[in-house]
């Protein structure tokens, strides 16, 4: 009865949304190209019984990389189909996951569409990153006796409240999942409270600690800096994954800081690239020099060329490597009540990390990171300003903070192997797949 009600409502909403889908298909090429896949119409390039991994967006795609590489190392002949929800996640997967044999958009969660996609893919297992719960996808995959594993599972306090409110529904969805591999004990407690079978839950850690990035040589670092228009004498303040309401604060702070730090450059990376025009309006209003990264001319960063005050990072999938250029890093989504973003990424480069008061999405990690001396949390604009001023003048404090953060990161690695060992029994026979 619950699924019948859901499907009636979903069908009704899908009909209502069809004019919008048609309009977007006409005006937006990327949406037009993705729509057939979302409707379950695509050609499969994989053989029978591939591993189906679903990673909703960019963050989930990146955190899936260590596990996917480990699976391919053990089962080199296994074919992998990866689906994403967002176009940015899709592009990121195609760029950073050569191990995936096919990258598609996840089917719209209508029973007819999902059934069509399952018959096309014919997976031997479905692995879902974090907590992307599509009711019909879960129900129909399980109906085919295909095991479903939720890996790197997490439930934020905000999401938990929503799940609890609709517990009667999500409890029915969770019964189709074979195994829950959760990040923390708190995540395990929450998923059980929502309705997961305690016997099917494990705490195995967080794959985000196991992400790997290239170790850049000094020459490569200089080349990357030059592409950003940097000459080597600048201090660089990177604000990553920023949201509306934060850019005004950060640009204003940067203007103030430049009065005492004339060579300070702000690299601003909005979380959503469709907001770039909005951010540019703020920059014009603040009367600062700025440029999009992709508009910087070849050879930018020459000795006689001053870089712009603000560089807008307008490319996808480059933020984590760009962090390597930073003197100081601010993690966005935390000065406004968004819930924050992953504070671990800059730590791979031993960077000095700051974030605001709103870190609900990474509450446990942020608390433990602060306790380890690996990051600084500020209450708002004024404290952020004072901490930035202090750290810009104190190289030793920056180095100690970055080193402590890196040690914290290393201490919590190992989730990949633990998850793989839990999933491995479901992959028996994969070595024989051709």
How would you describe each model-predicted region?
Residues 1-434:
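Nucleotide-activated sugar donor-binding and catalytic core shared by glycosyltransferases
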């Amino acid at each position: 009865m619950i699924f019948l009600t859901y499907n009636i409502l979903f069908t009704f909403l899908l009909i209502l949304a069809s004019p919008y889908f048609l309009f977007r298909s006409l005006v937006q090429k990327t949406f037009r190209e993705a729509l057939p896949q979302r409707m379950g119409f695509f050609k499969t390039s994989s053989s029978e019984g591939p591993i189906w991994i679903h990673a909703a967006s960019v963050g989930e795609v990146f955190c899936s990389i260590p596990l996917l590489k480990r699976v391919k190392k053990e089962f080199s002949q296994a074919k992998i189909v990866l689906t994403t929800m967002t176009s940015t996640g899709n592009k990121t997967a195609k760029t950073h996951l050569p191990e995936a044999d096919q990258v598609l958009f996840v089917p719209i969660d209508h029973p007819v569409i999902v059934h069509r996609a399952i018959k096309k893919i014919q997976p031997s297992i479905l692995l879902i990153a974090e907590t992307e719960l599509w009711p019909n996808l879960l129900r129909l995959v399980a109906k085919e006796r295909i095991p479903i594993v939720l890996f790197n599972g997490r439930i934020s306090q905000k999401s938990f409240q929503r799940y609890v409110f609709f517990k009667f529904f999500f409890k029915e969805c969770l019964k189709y999942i074979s195994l829950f591999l959760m990040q923390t004990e708190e995540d395990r407690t929450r998923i059980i409270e929502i309705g997961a079978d305690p016997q099917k839950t494990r705490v195995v850690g967080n794959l985000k600690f196991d992400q790997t990035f290239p170790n850049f040589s000094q020459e490569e670092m200089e080349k990357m800096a030059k592409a950003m228009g940097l000459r080597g004498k600048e201090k660089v303040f990177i604000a990553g994954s920023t949201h509306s309401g934060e850019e005004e604060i950060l640009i204003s702070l940067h203007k103030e800081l430049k009065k005492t730090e004339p060579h300070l450059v702000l690299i601003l990376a909005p979380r959503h690239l469709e907001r770039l025009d909005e951010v540019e309006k703020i920059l014009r209003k603040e009367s600062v020099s700025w440029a999009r990264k992709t508009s910087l001319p070849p050879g930018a960063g020459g000795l006689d060329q001053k870089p712009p005050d603000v560089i807008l990072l307008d490319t996808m999938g480059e933020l984590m490597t760009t962090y390597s250029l930073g003197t100081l890093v601010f993690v966005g989504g935390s000065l406004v009540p968004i819930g924050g973003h992953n504070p671990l990424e800059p730590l791979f480069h031993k960077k000095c990390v700051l974030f605001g008061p709103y870190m609900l999405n990474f509450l446990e990690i942020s608390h433990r990171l602060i306790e380890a001396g690996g990051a600084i949390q500020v209450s708002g604009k004024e404290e952020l300003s004072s901490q930035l001023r202090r750290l810009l003048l104190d190289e030793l404090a920056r180095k100690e903070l970055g080193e402590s953060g890196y040690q914290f990161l290393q201490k919590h690695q190992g989730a990949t192997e633990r998850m793989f060992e839990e999933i491995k029994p479901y992959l028996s026979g994969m070595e024989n797949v051709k």
